[in-house]
């Protein structure tokens, strides 16, 4: 390995000695020039001045300013050279100064000294207003620490000591010395960074070294140390094995691979010199010495002053134009691509111009590899258009990105040997290198990128546009029509991923496809599938979802979900299960959806999921409740909708809007993040319909329960099923005058009062008058089901409320009164008797109900209530005791828990039997 990557070698010591000797010679030469220029200036001062002492003082002052002013100019020049806002006029002046300095270095130094003299004279003239006389400069200031650093006559009497101190602190260097030190400094920085495996710094410093080397050419010949460095760096990079590359982190790994390609490309133009160096290293290094390196003719640096060991660089980095797009050839494509990627993320980047240039490059590309590289870059730039703006991607750009993704898939179909992968160990910028590397990879040419990432971004931008467009305008409908083309692209991309066999990416794409179909009716799913498959040739088919099975939506959803169950990560499996349950509930398969939800145990872990998954879980629970309602299961509907409908934040829990806080307001960032979680309007569940279903089921359950509680003094029957319904009903009861109902809530409250009074026909009229039922499929069947439920619950309410006033009642009479079959009345009465809700006996011979007189006095009622409260208090105390002692003896705790549970169960049974006997 070369000496550049070995620490503490003798060659580096020799170089440092040469550098110090070179600096000494340079400083002595410049000092002589300063003395000659100072003599000329002193002669001019003697002719213009009348006093010898004044001329000598001015001469010393000019010498001091001549050293200080170039220092300030060098520092300013270094700052201007590093900034990007330098004007064109200053560049022209710098170039003219550099040309004059190359032709005659001593003349440029004398000119700079004359300029510094003029500046010092202007400073003296500006200070004349503060001086009291011609010899006032001989007076010392009151505070020495306030002396200006550039005035020697204010330093005191020991002028020799101050001059010696300044010579130790300041060194005047020429441009070639600066370039030499900068050249060596870059190589040392690269050497140190390589020893610490910091390849990001190596990559950055390598670009800097190339720029400096262009300024250090020896009469058209490259510097020998630079050729030696390139040879050593190339050997270092080529000797790295795959194990070493894998040991690097992601950022350094990418930097290493990029540097390897750039070094390989850069060494092509120096290949002849590198070959000559490797044949005879000593002979190659003899002809040139670094201390004789002249400055380049085109661009030149500026002399600088090194103060306290801190150097400022005045070399302006050369700028390379890329030319006009009309002059681009296919050989220049990769150079343009690299320039475009380097400009990404900068504020001054014109993305529209980049898109125009890439579109031009796509027409110039002649091979599939070139087209693919340009298309990938063009997609990345298109997605950067609205970055940070908070707006959705323009629709024309979205359609263009969709077309380009189809073009990429066309390239894959035409050339199966070209694949796009997310991680490439060694990406080649040139097509010849890519083809050569493919020979070691079974002939497969790999391009870095991700089709799935592009599809996910395209899908996200489509969703964002639907979130921001007003859903009540034709623009929303027009935008929604693009979903068919997006779904077609998802199906086609699935075929490509199945062909290359990337399971993880396939699972991500399957999840996107499932998100587009799980909430839709069967007719819409079938139509989307037909449109998608019609655009493919007959030979196109899929493995996961074959063409023959996609005509049935149930089989399609099942196939997609099963694949995610077997191959997806935990989050994808959870979302797939929720989508599957949602679809089953949408198809009115309540028991299957309920069993899948219970067997998956999602309710135990969904609180730890992300917000989008929690919203999907809430939507699934609501859909299960609506499915139960469509099947006539009132109690199951009420239980499924209870948790969401009683929170008061239904819109937020379902991802259909944001509820403003009562106190304060959202911050802009919080408001933006919350809006991203809102689902598109066509995916919303009608909240008015949801409230109507919940209140109707609450009415059918609460009214009989309230009737049972009013007929007995026992507190056990006074439990509240739906607190929101109770509060609404109590509010209506407090009204002195109640007008005709106007909205859904008022219709249900009026129907509840009629049902409580036993007027089931009037209750049925109010429920049927609600217009929201027309939004449900098979609205007539829903109304018929509600009529039957109202009659049954009216019968239960009648028996529970008026059982105390009857000795017996005929089943035929009840069937006629409530318009129910006798068999149905018998079933309802038997259920009431089995649950001990009424104390009676059923006489099937005569078809009548025989009621028993069971009157509990006040003392017995209070006794039963006290016993129940005592049992509850005892149970609470036992639980508290178990929590305190659960870590002492687990076996004893389990035994005590088991025994205590059995004991409490027996006590409750005994108390219940005793109360029944009374």
From Swiss-Prot:
Location(s) in or outside the cell: Cytoplasm
Main location class: cytoplasm
One Pfam short name: PCI
Amino acid composition bias (Acidic residues), ranges on this chain: 36-47, 54-67, 79-128
Modified residues (Phosphoserine): 10, 12, 16, 19-20
InterPro entries: EIF3C, EIF3C_N_dom, PCI_dom, WH-like_DNA-bd_sf, WH_DNA-bd_sf
Segments for region (Disordered): 1-174, 879-918
Domain of life of the source: Eukaryota
PROSITE patterns in the record: PCI (PS50250)
Domain PCI: 681-856
GO cellular component: cytosol; eukaryotic 43S preinitiation complex; eukaryotic 48S preinitiation complex; eukaryotic translation initiation factor 3 complex; eukaryotic translation initiation factor 3 complex, eIF3e; eukaryotic translation initiation factor 3 complex, eIF3m
Annotated GO biological process: formation of cytoplasmic translation initiation complex; translational initiation
Entry-annotated residues carrying Phosphothreonine: 667
Signal peptide: none
Compositionally biased tracts (Basic and acidic residues): 907-918
Keywords linked to the UniProt accession: Cytoplasm, Initiation factor, Phosphoprotein, Protein biosynthesis
GO molecular function term, any single one: translation initiation factor activity
Function: Component of the eukaryotic translation initiation factor 3 (eIF-3) complex, which is involved in protein synthesis of a specialized repertoire of mRNAs and, together with other initiation factors, stimulates binding of mRNA and methionyl-tRNAi to the 40S ribosome. The eIF-3 complex specifically targets and initiates translation of a subset of mRNAs involved in cell proliferation.
Family: Belongs to the eIF-3 subunit C family.
Assembly information from the UniProt record: Component of the eukaryotic translation initiation factor 3 (eIF-3) complex. The eIF-3 complex appears to include tif32/eif3a, SPAC25G10.08/eif3b, tif33/eif3c, SPBC4C3.07/eif3f, tif35/eif3g and sum1/eif3i. This set of common subunits may also associate exclusively with either moe1/eif3d and int6/eif3e, or with SPAC821.05/eif3h and SPAC1751.03/eif3m. The eIF-3 complex may also include SPAC3A12.13c/eif3j.
Protein name: Eukaryotic translation initiation factor 3 subunit C
Organism whose genome encodes this protein: Schizosaccharomyces pombe (strain 972 / ATCC 24843) (Fission yeast)
């Amino acid at each position: 390995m070369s000496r550049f990557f070995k620490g503490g070698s003798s060659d580096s010591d020799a170089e440092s000695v040469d550098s110090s000797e070179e600096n000494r010679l340079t400083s002595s030469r410049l000092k002589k020039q300063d003395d000659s220029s100072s003599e000329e200036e002193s002669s001019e001062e003697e002719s213009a001045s009348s006093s010898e002492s004044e001329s000598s003082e001015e001469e010393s002052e000019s010498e001091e300013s001549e050293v200080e002013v170039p220092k300030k100019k060098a520092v300013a020049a270094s700052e201007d050279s590093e900034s990007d806002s330098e004007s064109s006029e200053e560049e022209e002046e710098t170039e003219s100064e550099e040309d004059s300095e190359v032709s005659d270095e001593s003349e440029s130094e004398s000119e700079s000294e004359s300029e510094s003299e003029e500046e010092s004279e202007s400073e003296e003239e500006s200070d004349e207003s503060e001086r009291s006389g011609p010899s006032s400069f001989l007076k010392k200031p009151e505070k020495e620490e306030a002396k200006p650093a550039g005035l020697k006559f204010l330093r005191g009497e020991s002028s020799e000591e101050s001059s010696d101190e300044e010579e130790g602190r300041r060194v005047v260097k020429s441009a070639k010395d600066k370039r030499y030190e900068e050249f060596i400094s870059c190589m040392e920085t690269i050497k140190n960074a390589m020893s610490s495996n910091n390849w990001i710094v190596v990559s950055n410093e390598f670009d800097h070294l190339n720029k400096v080397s262009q300024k250090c050419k020896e009469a058209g010949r490259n510097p020998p140390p630079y050729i030696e460095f390139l040879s050593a760096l190339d050997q270092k990079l080529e000797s790295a094995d795959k194990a070493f590359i894998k040991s690097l982190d992601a950022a350094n790994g990418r930097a290493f691979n990029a540097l390897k390609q750039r070094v390989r490309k850069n060494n092509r133009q120096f290949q002849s010199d590198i070959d000559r160096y490797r044949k005879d290293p000593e002979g190659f290094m003899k002809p040139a010495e670094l201390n004789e390196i002249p400055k380049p003719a085109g661009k030149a640096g500026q002399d600088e002053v090194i103060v306290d060991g801190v150097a400022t660089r005045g070399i302006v980095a050369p700028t390379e134009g890329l030319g006009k797009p009309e002059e681009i050839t296919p050989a220049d494509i990769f150079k343009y691509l690299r320039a475009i990627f380097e400009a990404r993320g900068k504020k001054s980047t014109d993305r529209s111009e980049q898109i125009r240039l890439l579109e031009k490059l796509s027409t110039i590309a002649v091979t599939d590899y070139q087209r693919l590289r340009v298309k990938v870059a063009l997609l990345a730039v298109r997605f950067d258009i609205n970055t940070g703006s908070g707006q959705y991607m323009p629709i024309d750009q979205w359609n263009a990105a969709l077309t380009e993704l189809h073009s990429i898939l066309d390239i894959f179909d035409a050339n199966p040997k070209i694949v796009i992968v997310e991680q490439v160990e060694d990406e080649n910028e040139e097509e010849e290198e890519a083809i050569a590397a493919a020979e070691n990879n079974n002939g497969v040419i790999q391009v870095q990128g991700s089709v799935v990432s592009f599809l996910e971004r395209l899908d996200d931008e489509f969703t964002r546009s639907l979130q921001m467009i007003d859903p009540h305008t034709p623009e929303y409908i027009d935008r929604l029509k693009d979903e068919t083309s997006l779904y077609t692209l998802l199906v086609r991309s699935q075929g490509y991923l199945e062909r290359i066999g990337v399971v993880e990416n396939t699972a991500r794409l399957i999840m996107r496809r499932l998100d587009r179909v799980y909430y839709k009716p069967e007719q819409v799913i079938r139509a989307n599938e037909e449109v998608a498959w019609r655009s493919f040739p007959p030979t196109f088919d899929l493995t996961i979802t074959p063409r023959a099975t996609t005509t049935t939506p149930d089989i399609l959803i099942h196939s997609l979900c099963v694949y995610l169950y077997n191959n997806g990560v935990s989050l994808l499996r959870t979302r797939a299960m929720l989508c599957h349950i949602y679809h089953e509930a949408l198809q009115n398969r309540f028991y299957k959806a309920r069993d899948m939800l219970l067997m998956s145990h999602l309710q135990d872990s969904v609180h730890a999921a992300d917000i989008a998954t929690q919203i999907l879980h809430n939507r699934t629970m609501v859909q299960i409740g609506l499915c139960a309602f469509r099947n006539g299961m009132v109690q199951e509907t009420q239980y499924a909708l209870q948790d969401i409908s009683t929170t008061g934040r239904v819109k937020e829990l379902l991802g259909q809007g944001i509820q403003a806080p009562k106190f304060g307001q959202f911050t802009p960032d919080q408001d933006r993040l919350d809006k991203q979680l809102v689902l598109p309007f066509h995916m919303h569940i009608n909240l008015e319909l949801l409230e109507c279903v919940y209140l109707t089921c609450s009415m059918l359950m609460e009214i009989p329960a309230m009737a049972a509680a009013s007929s007995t003094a026992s507190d056990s029957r006074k439990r509240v099923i739906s607190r929101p319904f109770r509060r609404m009903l109590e509010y209506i009861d407090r009204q002195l005058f109640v007008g005709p109902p106007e909205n859904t809530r008022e219709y249900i409250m009026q129907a509840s009062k009629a049902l409580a009074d036993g007027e089931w026909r009037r209750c049925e009229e109010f429920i049927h008058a609600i217009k929201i039922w027309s939004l449900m499929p098979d609205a007539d069947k829903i109304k018929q089901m509600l009529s039957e439920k109202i009659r049954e619950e009216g019968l239960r309410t009648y028996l529970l409320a008026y059982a105390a006033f009857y000795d017996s009642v005929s089943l035929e009479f009840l069937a006629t009164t409530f318009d129910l079959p006798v068999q149905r009345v018998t079933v309802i009465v038997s259920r009431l008797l089995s649950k001990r809700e009424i104390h009676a006996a059923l006489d099937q011979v005569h078809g009548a109900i025989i009621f028993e007189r069971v009157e509990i006095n006040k003392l017995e009622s209070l006794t039963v209530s006290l016993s129940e409260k005592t049992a509850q208090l005892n149970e609470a105390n036992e639980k508290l005791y178990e929590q305190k002692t659960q870590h002492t003896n687990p076996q004893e705790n389990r035994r005590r828990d088991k025994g205590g549970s059995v004991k409490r169960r027996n006590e409750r049974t005994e108390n219940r039997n005793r109360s029944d006997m009374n």
